[in-house]
């Protein structure tokens, strides 16, 4: 269920401060964050944000199509290796 419009987008304050600092200085270094729940806002466009997936930080380059989505959507937490093959199908 989407968030109410009257509440506005959720963004952790520590991440917002890092984004504002990077935009001011023009720094292209990835911003490391554990905040998967934060929403992508227009001021993040063009930045690389390293989102934690539980094991490592996955670099996510923010483009304009990503606005309104959450950071965690772009850093998968599970690796799918496929189902076991049928032994009968191999013969």
Curated annotation (Swiss-Prot):
Keywords: Ribonucleoprotein, Ribosomal protein, RNA-binding, rRNA-binding. One of its GO terms (molecular function) is rRNA binding. One of its GO terms (biological process) is ribosomal small subunit assembly. InterPro entries: Ribosomal_uS19, Ribosomal_uS19_bac-type, Ribosomal_uS19_CS, Ribosomal_uS19_SF. The keyword Metal-binding does not apply. GO terms for cellular component: cytoplasm; small ribosomal subunit. Belongs to the universal ribosomal protein uS19 family. Protein S19 forms a complex with S13 that binds strongly to the 16S ribosomal RNA. This is Small ribosomal subunit protein uS19. It comes from Haemophilus ducreyi (strain 35000HP / ATCC 700724). The gene is rpsS.
